Amino acid sequence: MRLLVIECATECCSVALFEQDRLLGGTAQVLGRGHAEALVPMIAALPGKGQAERIAVSLGPGSFTGLRVGLAAARALALAWRADLLGYPTLALVAAMACAEASSRTDKAPVSVAMSGGHGEWFLGEFGPDGAALAPPKSLTPAAAAQAARADLVAGSQAAALVAARGFGQALTILPDARQLLLLDPALLSQVVQLHYGRAPDARLPGGTLLSDTLFDGAWPGTPQ
């Protein structure tokens, strides 16, 4: 059974095609912007044009636009191919990648994940040595994130900045990569495919209802409730 993975939560857009535990093909591009234009050609360049029985897409937290682009493509392909649609938490993939890299050089250790967020904030997640989330991710100012980060090992796009801000620790600059999905605990692949932006949009619907109230249900895949 083939699995197509779509990762658009950050400035790095990546895709991968697996058959069981074997990577058939994949690519990653650091774009900043332009995920919508790049994603479909990247999928089409995969073996068999990326067609698969299952599709996994990054659910965030991350870029509003990138997450929506990834999910829209995943839903369209799942409908066209009659494929199963799954989602996974972005920061958990970064943590899994960091744990794999760190364990090759030292004993397993907890990891804090710090990624670029919106409005100058950072997404911060805390993970155990096995990559399991210890709490839901938060969107914090850089100063607050530096204070809140628990682990000596910090991974993500803002890892170096966080380590510099607090004055200690080891930084692994990592962006989520679809080609590394098999590092993630399979239990984190969820059939509940709902985006988690990590912070509430600064907008209200007519009548004053916060847009965030329509986007969040408080449940983060793989995190304690």
Where are these predicted regions, by residue range?
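Short glycine-rich phosphate-binding loop at a beta-alpha junction
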Residues: 51-60, 152-160
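Short, conserved beta-strand segments within well-ordered enzyme catalytic domains
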Residues: 16, 28, 54-58
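Oxyanion-binding and handling regions
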Residues: 1-23, 30-37, 86-225
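Short, well-ordered alpha-helices that flank and scaffold nucleotide-derived cofactor binding pockets
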Residues: 41-45, 75, 79, 100-101
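DPxDG-like acidic metal-binding loop motif
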Residues: 56-85, 90
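A short glycine/serine-rich beta->alpha loop
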Residues: 26-31, 59-63
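Phosphate/pyrophosphate-binding loops at sites that engage ATP/ADP/AMP, CoA/4′-phosphopantetheine
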Residues: 43-54, 103, 147-152
